[in-house]
């Protein structure tokens, strides 16, 4: 599918995708991507490094892995003879090149695999070299970047090659434990033991356009199952749809995307130590000045909160934040379109943003399931907030959902458990969290993104245990009583501010956000900054303790509200 880029003095090259005859210099100028069909040719490690890192910045690691022939393997040739031939043909010592470099000025340790060397297979020496690169990243506290190209474990080294999956994985685990970022770049092909270890257990997984990745190769799958495989099976685009990778990036954009990720990783705050801060007290109820929206009719507010012209999460990200890089997938087989999230810049600070996404048109709403997250959506959000905690990034959540997906599939896939795990994780997340209810805050689907240090709410948003229609159908029972139910539920921003559920109400441009979306976006940006910045210097232990205290106050013994009180 993706033949190796031609070497030496060849003047012409035939594309492996469309069979076009291409002038070699033109192909090289286009980064070995066919200008006719976009097929990406395979690159050797040297060419890959030249495209990704800053000129002159790469320094190879001084260590050289020992020669190994652990089991004396012989097929038609002794294994050492195959190693000699591979070294002669590639000029490499092994199937990976490791060192340190900068990408757009950001330091990293980097390991680049080369498929030309015995199919990029993972043997003891390759595992040792990548592990040393990870250990260098840990020692220097710089991100690790791994560019994969491999057919899998090296058969000639027997089960010891299998052990390299664990060896490198535990080196990645050490990076996670220490909060040192790791990023993998999947190139064609990435299979077997490499795919099932360090290629996919990094913090962020990028895939070059057209790259194929899987545990078993397509030929094996056909033989075992006796079935034909779907078009595009195991390609980067297939993997994205099935939640396996964060991004699919064409080669010309790969360096830029990598630079943005490294910049975000470098901008994370280190854990703040020390004792408690007496001036930080999220247990206090909001002041009357913070509670706007007095006198608004609850049912009319519901209608405004649902207006399709209100800004969506992607609208807020487009103009209220800078440099958004969306990260996809739950890593378990799906990418829910009702939840979007990723890395963004807020006034020079990298943040993780996660939110529900609805849309403005009927087609958009249907494609996004009206902002109703599936279990995959909640698990994607969970993965991203955990990543934020590891990288030391604050979290901003934007809540706009009528509720979690109530379908049969969602129940079969563990909707309740997915929501529960989000709530549990957010209660102890060791990084600042600011949540904004921007439209509808529907029940547990909303709370799954709204357990936060500060909860803000737009003036004409709503937040409720159930929709007014649902409440009316159950308790009246008459769906036409929805307006009456809305008033009884106390779901407006002013009501919830008085109850202490939200900390502040964000004013909307008159008469509501959909009349002036840019102004609404700016108001949210300013409010998030005002509430987030003071949290950045709070010691982690204090932050978590105060967040727990914030939600503990909603117990019956602490509310101080008499039965039947209005």
Curated annotation (Swiss-Prot):
This is Acetyl-coenzyme A carboxylase carboxyl transferase subunits beta/alpha. GO terms for biological process: fatty acid biosynthetic process; malonyl-CoA biosynthetic process. Component of the acetyl coenzyme A carboxylase (ACC) complex. Biotin carboxylase (BC) catalyzes the carboxylation of biotin on its carrier protein (BCCP) and then the CO(2) group is transferred by the transcarboxylase to acetyl-CoA to form malonyl-CoA. Pathway: Lipid metabolism; malonyl-CoA biosynthesis; malonyl-CoA from acetyl-CoA: step 1/1. Residues 11-280 form the CoA carboxyltransferase N-terminal domain. The gene is accD. It is an enzyme of class 2 (transferase). It is found in: Cytoplasm.
């Amino acid at each position: 599918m993706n033949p190796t880029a031609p070497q030496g003095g060849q003047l012409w090259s035939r594309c492996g995708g469309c069979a076009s005859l291409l002038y070699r210099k033109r192909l090289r100028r286009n980064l070995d991507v066919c200008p006719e069909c976009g097929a990406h040719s395979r690159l050797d490690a040297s060419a890959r490094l030249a495209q990704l890192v800053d000129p002159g910045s790469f320094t190879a690691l001084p260590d050289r892995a020992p020669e190994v022939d652990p089991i004396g393997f012989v097929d038609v040739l002794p294994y050492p003879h195959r190693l000699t031939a591979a070294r002669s043909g590639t000029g490499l010592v092994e199937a990976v090149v490791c060192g340190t470099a900068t990408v757009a000025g950001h330091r990293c340790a980097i390991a680049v695999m080369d498929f030309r060397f015995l199919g990029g297979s993972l043997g003891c020496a390759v595992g040792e070299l990548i592990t040393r690169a990870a250990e260098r990243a840990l020692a220097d506290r710089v991100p690790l970047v791994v560019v994969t190209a491999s057919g899998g474990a090296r058969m000639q080294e027997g089960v010891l090659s299998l052990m390299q999956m664990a060896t490198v994985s535990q080196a990645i685990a050490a990076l996670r434990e220490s909060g040192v970022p790791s990023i993998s770049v999947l190139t064609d092909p990435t299979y077997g033991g490499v795919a099932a270890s360090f290629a996919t257990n990094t913090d962020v997984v990028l895939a070059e356009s057209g790259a194929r990745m899987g545990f078993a190769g397509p030929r094996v799958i056909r033989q075992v199952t006796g079935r034909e495989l779907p078009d595009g099976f195991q390609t980067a685009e297939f993997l994205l749809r099935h939640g396996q990778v964060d991004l699919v990036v064409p080669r010309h954009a790969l360096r830029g995307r990598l630079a943005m990720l490294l910049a975000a990783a470098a901008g994370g705050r280190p854990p703040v130590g020390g004792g408690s801060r007496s001036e930080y007290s999220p247990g206090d109820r909001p002041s009357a000045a913070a509670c706007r929206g007095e006198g608004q009719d609850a049912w009319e507010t519901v209608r405004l909160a649902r207006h399709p012209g209100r800004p969506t999460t992607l609208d807020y990200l487009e103009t209220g934040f800078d440099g958004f890089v969306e990260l996809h997938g739950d890593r378990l087989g799906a990418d829910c379109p009702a939840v979007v999230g990723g890395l963004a810049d807020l006034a020079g600070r990298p943040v993780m943003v996660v939110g529900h996404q609805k849309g403005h048109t009927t087609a958009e709403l249907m494609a996004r399931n009206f902002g109703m997250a599936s279990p995959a959506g909640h698990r994607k959000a969970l993965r991203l907030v955990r990543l934020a905690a590891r990288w030391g990034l604050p979290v901003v959540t934007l809540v706009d959902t009528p509720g979690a997906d109530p379908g049969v599939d969602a129940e079969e896939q563990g909707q309740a458990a997915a929501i529960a795990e989000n709530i549990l994780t957010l209660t102890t997340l060791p990084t600042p969290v600011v949540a904004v209810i921007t439209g509808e805050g529907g029940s547990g689907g909303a709370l799954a993104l709204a357990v936060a240090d500060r909860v803000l709410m737009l003036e004409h948003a709503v937040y409720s245990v159930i929709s007014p229609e649902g409440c009316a159908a159950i308790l009246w029972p008459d769906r036409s009583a929805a307006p009456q139910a809305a008033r009884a539920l106390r779901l407006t921003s002013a009501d919830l501010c008085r109850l202490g559920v939200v900390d502040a109400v964000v004013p909307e441009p008159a008469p509501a956000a959909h009349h002036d979306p840019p102004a609404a976006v700016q108001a949210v940006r300013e409010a998030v900054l005002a509430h987030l910045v003071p949290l950045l210097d709070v010691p982690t232990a204090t932050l978590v303790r105060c967040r727990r205290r914030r939600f503990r106050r909603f117990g019956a013994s602490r509310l101080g509200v008499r039965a039947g009180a209005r």
